[in-house]
C-alpha cells in the first residue's frame, strides 16, 4: 500500500503525543533528535493485512473521523466489519510512524509498500485515461475506480481520503463542530492508493459510502401545460414523472427521459433544441394535440436521423386516454426493469433506447400472436363456404342431369313409336344416322323418296305414343336427337337475332318452323337446361 500525504512544518512534534499502545505495534517511531533524516517512509515489508490485524488499542477520535469511499462497479453492499477495521487505522500512526533510517524533519511523501513494483503501479495510475479522472472529479469526494487500460484485471486501485488534524490540535483533541471537520478535510488530506496485484494475497473492499444513491427512473415534464398534464396523471403513475423545480436546462442529464408536451410545432422544435444543447441523445416522449401526429413524426425524423434524440415512446395525443394509459403502463414496466438491472447494466440512455426498441419488437410479436387466431378462423369459414357451395352445385347439377335424362329418354321413346305417313319401309337406325342431314328434316333411304319435313314426323301423337323402355339403340337415338336439336337451335337463334321484332311472325310464316316443331324445340330446350 502506498501512502501519499503532505505534512505541515508544525507537525514535527506530533510524535510526542503518541498513545502508549502504539509501541506494541510493528510500526516503530523515530526520535526527535533525528531531524536530518528522512521521515514518513514505513517499513516496505509491512502488508495491509498486518495493519488490519493489529490489536491492543482502541480507535482514537481522529480515527473515527476517517472518511473512506471506494467505488467498486457491480458491488453495492456494505460490510461493517471491514469498514471497522479500516477505521482502526489511526491517522497519527500513518503520519508519525517512521523508520529510523529514513526519518527527516522536512515535508516528505510516505509510502507503505505491499510489493516491490510500486513504481510501475504509480506510473500506471498517472497514465490513467482522462475520462476516468473527470469521472472522479464529478463524483466529488467519494472517489472512483481508476483501472489501468494495460492491466484491467491484474490491478485494482482505490482512492481513500483521510482527514489530518489541524495546525493547533493534538491527536486526542475532539472537534467541536462539523465545519472544522470539513476545513480539516479540505486543507490536510492524505491520499492512499492501494494496489492489489494478482500475485499477492488480496481482498476486495466493498463500497463503504452510504451517500451515493442508486439511479432512479424519473421523467422530466417540459412545456407550458406541463403542470396541468402532471395533475391529470393517475396517482399510481405520478411517481414516475417530475416537474422542473428550477428552470435550469443543466439538470436534463439527471433524468432518465424527458416528456415534451406542446401546443404548437414551434414550441416543440425549441424544446428539442434545448434538449440537444444540454443533453444530446436523451430519450423523449412527445405529447401533441389532435391532428398533429403526422407533423410531429416528420419533425422527429430529422432529429432521429442525426441521432440528436432518441424516442422512448411514440407520439401520443393528449386527448387519447387509451394511448396515455398504454404509455403509463409501459413506463411503469420499464421502471421496474430499470431498478432490477441497475446493478448489471450501465446507467446510460443507450440502454433505455434498446429497451424501447425491444418493447416495440415485443409489441409487434404480441400483435401477431393476437391476430393469428383470427387468421386461423378465416380459412375455416372459407372451407365451410367452399363445401357449402360445392354441395349446392352438386345437388343442382344432379337434379339437372336427372331431369335431362328423363326428358331425353321420354323423347327418344316417343321418336321410336312415332307414326310415319310417307315412309313405308322403316330404315335401320344406323342408316338413318348416316343419312341424316342437319340442314334438312328428311331421312333419305334407297327405296323411298324423301317426303316433306312437315309430313315425316308426328311428335306427341296421343293415339300412337307408346313408351318402350326395352327398345334397342338408345345411344344412337340420343345422338340423332342431339344433332338434330343442335341444328334447329342454331337456325332458331340466328333468326331470333336477325329479326327480334318479327320473331313471332317468322315462326308462323316459315315452313321450317311449324307448331309441332316449335313444341319439339321447346321440349328439347328443357334438356339443355
Curated annotation (Swiss-Prot):
Residue ranges spanning the membrane: these are 389-411
Topology versus the membrane = Single-pass membrane protein
Ranges of biased composition (kind: Basic residues): 370-381
Could you tell me where the Basic and acidic residues compositional bias lies?
Answer: 1-11
Q: Name one GO biological process term.
A: autophagy
Which modifications occur after translation, per UniProt? Phosphorylation of Ser-114 and Ser-119 are critically important for mitophagy and for the ATG11-ATG32 interaction. Phosphorylation depends on both HOG1 and PBS2.
Phosphoserine is found on 114, 119
- Among the entry's GO cellular component annotations, what is one? vacuolar membrane
Q: Which UniProt keywords apply?
A: Autophagy, Membrane, Mitochondrion, Mitochondrion outer membrane, Phosphoprotein, Transmembrane, Transmembrane helix, Vacuole
Sequence segments annotated as region (Disordered):
1-41, 345-381
Q: Which domain of life is it from?
A: Eukaryota
Compositional bias of kind Polar residues: 25-34
- Subcellular localization: Mitochondrion outer membrane; Vacuole membrane; Preautophagosomal structure membrane
UniProt-listed CDD domains: psREC_Atg32 (cd19929)
Where does this protein have compositionally biased stretches of type Low complexity?
12-24
Q: What's the stated role of this polypeptide? A: Mitophagy-specific receptor that recruits the autophagic machinery to mitochondria and regulates selective degradation of mitochondria. Mitophagy contributes to regulate mitochondrial quantity and quality by eliminating the mitochondria to a basal level to fulfill cellular energy requirements and preventing excess ROS production. Recruits ATG11 to the surface of mitochondria. Also promotes autophagy-dependent peroxisome degradation.
As for family, the record states: Belongs to the ATG32 family.
How this chain assembles, per its entry, is: interacts with ATG8 and ATG11.
Please state what the protein is called: Autophagy-related protein 32
Origin species: Saccharomyces cerevisiae (strain RM11-1a) (Baker's yeast)
